[in-house]
Amino acid sequence: MSKILKIIGREIIDSRGNPTIECEVLLEGGFVGLASVPSGASTGSFETWELRDQDKNRFMGKGVQKAVEIINNKIFYSLKNKNAIDQFDIDQTMINLDGTENKSNLGSNSILSVSLATAKAAASSKGMPLYQHIAEINNTPGVFSMPLPMINIINGGKHANNNIDIQEFMIQPISAKSITEAIRIGAEIFHSLGNLLKDKGMSTTVGDEGGYAPNFKSNEEALNVIQDAVHKTKYKLGKDITLAIDCAASELYNKTRKKYQFIGEGTEFSSQELTHYLKKLSNKYPIISIEDGQDESDWEGFLYQTKELGNSLQLVGDDLFVTNKNILKKGIKKGVANAILIKLNQIGTLTETIETIKIAKKFNYGVIISHRSGETEDTSIADLSVGTASGQIKTGSMSRSDRTSKYNQLIRIEEILNKKRAPFYGLKEVKSSF
């Protein structure tokens, strides 16, 4: 009843108005899986290859018709009549068919859409939700947890058209007793921030990930405004709420000058100076998690930063690790960072993603499941976070349905599983001494 009968790829639109792929997998018995894939703005150089048409007369070269054709022909005929429940076989068949290290023949966007749609179809054929099927793929059946959210309330960098250098300013509702409560707290602070910005005569337009995107004189001004917004609620910064930032430092790094250029502030830092700057911020504000605090290729800089800050703060590798198990192993061996950001489309299949999560957890690295700046209504990452008991999730702000769809899915899952079957550990999941 789980044999693949048909695979259909189609070109749809993502949250930035760019084309992306949606895939439908039909199994015998009438079971169907539907999945769509995201796309990043600030991408790591070592991510797998996203196949685009490069036809400048159509979608400014970003069309995915070639990828859709590959799904409907090459991939379909390689997977036809296969057992959808055997996710490893499905993914490995596509990896072998592609034959490259970075999936540049078929495109990781083609492969991932089929991988996720197949998993959803298989879950349907087994009469279970996706998170339960993922737990079984993970060889941890029945083991679930609800993640602590990093809620992005101010967007900067490549995610917004403003002058803020740091790409994401996030809040973590650490006093919450459930994901549902954490989401409510996040929404209340999001609205408090919006009202405060209005009172200051500042813009309340939002960036790619749904956070506010005004101009600020400095990163510290952004942090001060967040601090004020929290104070205007019943919550206490440092007690109920902690902060997290994504520097996306690779986007700030000038390779010619070998400096990190904070253009919005009119200053620049060496590798070590950037670490000292981030240390100063974390001493002044309750920042407990810093993502990509160095350029993706600056392993020495990351090692220094880990030695300086790693005992007290969660240091997250995104562009550094790109959800690649081999790069993560290198980081573990060198003692670089203490957490990893997981993005399905950085590596391109569900099984490879799960394998990377397993390695991270084995070596006590924090795991944060993440969206991309160009998203769809697909909620697979919510199920992935619960089904692998990853502990943390980063899926944007409290606006834009491409972001809130994931939060709403987590609310539904928590309602089904309740706290006994899927505990919410909150702050315990963060690799910091806070």
Swiss-Prot record:
| Sites where the protein binds Mg(2+) | 246, 291, 318
Q: What is this protein called?
A: Enolase
**Pfam families associated with the record:** Enolase_C (PF00113), Enolase_N (PF03952)
Question: What's the Enzyme Commission number for this chain?
Answer: 4.2.1.11
- State its location(s): Cytoplasm; Secreted; Cell surface
* Source species taxonomy: Bacteria, Pseudomonadati, Pseudomonadota, Gammaproteobacteria, Enterobacterales
Entry's Gene Ontology BP terms:
glycolytic process
Report quaternary structure and partners. Answer: Component of the RNA degradosome, a multiprotein complex involved in RNA processing and mRNA degradation.
- Main location (coarse class): cytoplasm
Q: Which cofactor does it need?
A: Mg(2+)
Per UniProt, which keywords does this protein have?
Answer: Cytoplasm, Glycolysis, Lyase, Magnesium, Metal-binding, Secreted
- Identify the SUPFAM superfamilies for this entry: Enolase C-terminal domain-like, Enolase N-terminal domain-like
Database matches in PROSITE patterns: ENOLASE
Q: Which residues bind (2R)-2-phosphoglycerate?
A: 167, 343, 372-373, 394
Q: What organism does the record attribute this protein to?
A: Buchnera aphidicola subsp. Schizaphis graminum (strain Sg)
The record's InterPro entries line, in alphabetical order, gives: Enolase, Enolase-like_C_sf, Enolase-like_N, Enolase_C, Enolase_CS, Enolase_N
UniProt GO MF annotations: magnesium ion binding; phosphopyruvate hydratase activity
Q: Which SMART domains match?
A: Enolase_C, Enolase_N
Active-site residues?
209, 343
